[in-house]
Amino acid sequence: MASEFKKKIFWRAVVAEFLAMTLFIFISIGSALGFQYPVRNNQTSGAAQDNVKVSLAFGLSIATLAQSVGHISGAHLNPAVTLGLLLSCQISVLRAVMYIIAQCVGAIVATAILSGITSSLPGNSLGLNSLAPGVDSGQGLGIEIIGTLQLVLCVLATTDRRRRDLGGSAPLAIGFSVALGHLLAIDYTGCGINPARSFGSAVITHNFQDHWVFWVGPFIGGALAVLIYDFILAPRSSDLTDRVKVWTSGQVEEYDLDGDDINSRVEMKPK
């Protein structure tokens, strides 16, 4: 663990997570907030249409940033994804902790900037996740679990280095998965499926009502996705010793921007 801490590529990856998360939150929530402004020419905007726009904003921003920094950090951009890859023994405990901190700080910074830019917006919630009227915490938890499960399952499948049948773009597939999660959950919980995204809005608005739902749900969903993929759908043969080695020291094969160890396939490869 100490050896990974001393590597430049490790800190590049942490910085990449912070910067990408800041851009992701600013672009996606900024796009969602824009739909609250009055529509010009006396036109009205339907809720269903707005949901599609918001879903696409989140999905496309993830796809774009995953393509941009995936070769540097793996582009997790989500503590639930980071937890999933940790439980799947693809990253070390140290990397997981530092990534989650970077993601949360990035979300807070982006939301704070948005707060200043959109301060005149009436009823500005800064994308705060909250349970819709009639939705209790248990139902919201279930929605967050399912929405995150399909996302982390997609990440595990599209970044599985054992596969030889992968075609197309992994970042785009993951972006569509994020959009799909929003289409499912946005009317029930505002769609968290990303604890850091929810945390940034809660911190800046000082509103933590039912906030636990947006941490517990995604983490359960991410853990279930690992259980389903790694132990049922595509079992891994790694023994306990190998798994512990990854948790303490990280993956043996890493993408190095200095060219020390560059693998042939690097697209969205988790570090």
UniProtKB/Swiss-Prot annotation:
Domain of life, source organism: Eukaryota
Protein name per UniProt: Aquaporin-1
UniProt keywords, alphabetically: Cell membrane, Glycoprotein, Membrane, Phosphoprotein, Repeat, Transmembrane, Transmembrane helix, Transport
Subunit structure: Homotetramer; each monomer provides an independent water pore. Component of the ankyrin-1 complex in the erythrocyte, composed of ANK1, RHCE, RHAG, SLC4A1, EPB42, GYPA, GYPB and AQP1. Interacts with EPHB2; involved in endolymph production in the inner ear. Identified in a complex with STOM. Interacts (via the N-terminal) with ANK1 (via ANK 1-5 repeats). Interacts (via the C-terminal) with EPB42.
Phosphoserine sites (modified residues): S249, S264
Entry's Gene Ontology BP terms: ammonium transmembrane transport; carbon dioxide transmembrane transport; carbon dioxide transport; cell volume homeostasis; cellular homeostasis; cellular hyperosmotic response; cellular response to cAMP; cellular response to copper ion
Residues on Cytoplasmic side: 1-11, 68-70, 85-92, 156-165, 227-271
The keyword Phosphoprotein is annotated on this UniProt entry: yes
Motif (NPA 1): 78-80
InterPro entries registered for this protein in UniProt: Aquaporin-like (IPR023271), Aquaporin_1 (IPR023274), Aquaporin_transptr (IPR034294), MIP (IPR000425), MIP_CS (IPR022357)
Intramembrane segments: 71-84, 189-201
Membrane topology listed for this record: Multi-pass membrane protein
GO function terms (MF aspect): ammonium channel activity; carbon dioxide transmembrane transporter activity; glycerol transmembrane transporter activity; intracellularly cGMP-activated cation channel activity; nitric oxide transmembrane transporter activity; potassium channel activity; transmembrane transporter activity; water channel activity
Species of provenance: Sus scrofa (Pig)
Motif mapping: NPA 2: 194-196
Topology feature Extracellular, residues: 30-48, 112-135, 184-188, 202-208
Residue numbers bearing the Phosphotyrosine modification: Y255
The protein's role, per its UniProt record: Forms a water channel that facilitates the transport of water across cell membranes, playing a crucial role in water homeostasis in various tissues. Could also be permeable to small solutes including hydrogen peroxide, glycerol and gases such as amonnia (NH3), nitric oxide (NO) and carbon dioxide (CO2). Recruited to the ankyrin-1 complex, a multiprotein complex of the erythrocyte membrane, it could be part of a CO2 metabolon, linking facilitated diffusion of CO2 across the membrane, anion exchange of Cl(-)/HCO3(-) and interconversion of dissolved CO2 and carbonic acid in the cytosol.
Keyword Secreted attributed: no
Annotated localization: Cell membrane
